[in-house]
């Protein structure tokens, strides 16, 4: 079962580096890969590959638990989360754990529980990983045919795909259940400055949910990143979970159609490239989502978005100068446009100055001051509440910008708060990881296609240039 076909046919890339180091029969000679090629040695050893994946999951979950407890240990309830360099607690707070009105943390115990549960889970996964890597069967096909597979078995591969889709669908429904029945989630739009609430009136209309996918990605539209109410987010998860589960069942019950059998490459490396491509897309979408969206990523926990900080500064100075007697409705700025307020090309009243580029920002502290034609002058003169002033002054000084030059007019003098926004971290890290995953997708897709076409030869190791060079020492 292990050697259904010539290893040289499917691994023609010669990778001799240190052929003498043998690891439990998984050496260069038997696999075509040297020790440093990592899991490539395990391509046809389903049991050992399972061990590697379970151990990897254990490392991931261990990091989550340890980092979670580290953040709990360092957490100062009197300071905003986004001032403390936290990247995990904001996610737990967004799910409604431990927070009250205005995003104030009232109980850190749920965060502690989360960390401990992840640590315990990681121990179980770590044990399973070590067991399958060292003690379990090398291949699962003989003893546990349900869990065994051969990479070119198209029907088995789509069955595995189906199982994964069902698990993803269940994950989507876990969020739905939390929002509907288990305490609700944090809603930054709740009246008075945000609160935890149960989401009862879900948006299930397909025209609304799928309308997001048909929107333009540009300003004022913003594709799915423009979602700004939790009913749509949770309703979207109902749709997504249902599609994943139905699609998973379909993939388990069916075999690939002829066009799919012809169009796709059916090898382990090809599946790796497909997965990396998908993860890359997820990374780029997540980057835009965390950078621009303050509903799924509330500013109370992640800090303001870039546009939000810029608009908050314009609002703060409008409030100040209006108190000092300025007529904010008619004051002219240095360019001849309105200094505080101006009209957009389509006629709405928007903030003037450099922040005009962020005219389409929506934020809970600003929306009450809008009327049917944009910002309402009479509300700006009579209805501004103290909490809106405090919130905007706080956001103005916590822009997620570092020290960029083009910052939408935000004052970034060097005496500002020593501060890196978690929004910056999360957006940047997901962009960078998305890019690396995309490069990995191209690399493995190219190798998989070349191997399938039969012309991947690799370097001729007998006459490799480095062999004739003098040693470095």
Curated annotation (Swiss-Prot):
Organism whose genome encodes this protein: Buxus microphylla
Cofactor info, note text: Binds multiple chlorophylls and provides some of the ligands for the Ca-4Mn-5O cluster of the oxygen-evolving complex. It may also provide a ligand for a Cl- that is required for oxygen evolution. PSII binds additional chlorophylls, carotenoids and specific lipids.
Name by which UniProt lists this protein: Photosystem II CP43 reaction center protein
UniProt KW keywords: Acetylation, Chlorophyll, Chloroplast, Chromophore, Manganese, Membrane, Metal-binding, Phosphoprotein, Photosynthesis, Photosystem II, Plastid, Thylakoid, Transmembrane, Transmembrane helix
Regions that span the bilayer: 69-93, 134-155, 178-200, 255-275, 291-312, 447-471
Record note on quaternary structure: PSII is composed of 1 copy each of membrane proteins PsbA, PsbB, PsbC, PsbD, PsbE, PsbF, PsbH, PsbI, PsbJ, PsbK, PsbL, PsbM, PsbT, PsbX, PsbY, PsbZ, Psb30/Ycf12, at least 3 peripheral proteins of the oxygen-evolving complex and a large number of cofactors. It forms dimeric complexes.
Modified residues (N-acetylthreonine): 15
Record localization: Plastid, Chloroplast thylakoid membrane
Its biological purpose: One of the components of the core complex of photosystem II (PSII). It binds chlorophyll and helps catalyze the primary light-induced photochemical processes of PSII. PSII is a light-driven water:plastoquinone oxidoreductase, using light energy to abstract electrons from H(2)O, generating O(2) and a proton gradient subsequently used for ATP formation.
One term of GO molecular function: metal ion binding
